[in-house]
Amino acid sequence: LAQGGAMLSETEAEALIFGHAAGNDLTRRDLQAEAKAARRPWDMAKGFDASAVVGAIRPGPLADGAIRCTVDGAIRQEARLSDMIWPVPAILAYLSRLVALCPGDLVFTGTPAGVGPLHRGETCTVDIDGLDPATVTLD
């Protein structure tokens, strides 16, 4: 985000957007399962070291295009950005009612159907038309 704000309308939220990037917010399912079993919050399943893989940020608006995720070159997920459930301004407006948004915030906005496990040694790439890919090889 280029600017921050709270309690925003969708129009106000859209004006905060600096640019777009491909990204992958990884989840450690082992930590998630442990936390759920213990009836504890599972934030750390999403917030562990190196859990947010992000490509280069391209300033400006993003045209509709494809988003895809490949694992070792095989397509696992693929959809049009226009098929995502919530438009980005709606997501930002909703978030701004829960927490203040700040300049520099990166917001991951969802994924197409097909989420699945990744294993050590696999290379996962998230690619969005018009953006640099976000790639990670799991150690």
Which residues make up each language-model segment?
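Catalytic-core "active-site belt" of small-molecule-metabolizing enzymes
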Residues: 1-102, 106, 114-139
